[in-house]
UniProtKB/Swiss-Prot annotation:
It comes from Pseudomonas aeruginosa (strain ATCC 15692 / DSM 22644 / CIP 104116 / JCM 14847 / LMG 12228 / 1C / PRS 101 / PAO1). Disulfide bonds: none annotated. SUPFAM superfamilies: Hypothetical protein YjbJ. Pfam families: CsbD (PF05532). This is UPF0337 protein PA4738. Gene3D superfamilies: YjbJ. Belongs to the UPF0337 (CsbD) family.
Length: 65
């Protein structure tokens, strides 16, 4: 997971993140503040995914940046 890319461009990415995962709230994204592991946890919580699935989703997202 390229968490450096996510952290470094967090403010620019929040719109794309909300497009991809619309169940995440502005508060979720503000609290995550670019931390991929927090984002993974929120995806698990909001979508009921396993940790592995949420990590893969974030990995796929960051690979497309």
């Amino acid at each position: 997971m390229n968490s450096d890319v996510i952290k470094g461009k967090w403010k620019q990415l929040t719109g794309k993140i909300k497009e991809r995962w619309g169940d995440l709230t502005d508060d979720d994204l503000q609290a995550a503040d670019g931390h991929a592991e927090y984002l993974v946890g929120k995806l698990q919580e909001r979508y009921g995914w396993s940790k592995e699935r949420a990590e893969q989703e974030v990995r796929d997202f960051s690979d497309r940046l």
